[in-house]
Amino acid sequence: MHYVGIDLAWGQRARTGVALLDASGRLVSSSSVRTDDEIVEFLGDDARGPGLIVAIDAPLIVPNEAGQRPCEREVNAHFHRFHAGAYPSNRGMAAFNPQPRGARLALRFGWDMDPRTPPAEDTSVAIEVYPHPAMVTLFDLPRVLKYKRGRGRTVESRRNELLHAMNGMDDA
């Protein structure tokens, strides 16, 4: 098995982070790209074929016309108090109609998006992930780390939050 992580922007203007990891979880390569074609070019043949788990930080399956998906409601019920909730996604939003960007990539690469399909050596699966709730849980945090750009956040404060997260990885 090997792994791909995609911090997928909902549109093709903002940057998307892409990382490829080997079977032991070591980083092989990473990049920041914008378009689906750039993602395909970066990943190339490493993201095709069996034995691959692709973790995508973006909605993959969006059947609802309005409001939130049940998974978003569930995440928000448990993680809102940690400032680690999920944004709502629905087909009324242009980014998800007719199809979410993550689903388009999964189809392009042949990744199975069915959440009932277990990862295996003879298949490649794409799973939707929620990094902020994962960080809160894995590192036993009182709130999500504020390492992204935002109102009132300085470069120094964001750097400190990111270093805190990275230091926590040694303990996880």
Task: Report each predicted region and the residues it spans.
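RNase H-like (RuvC/DEDD) metal-dependent nuclease/polynucleotide-processing core
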Residues: 1-4, 8-172
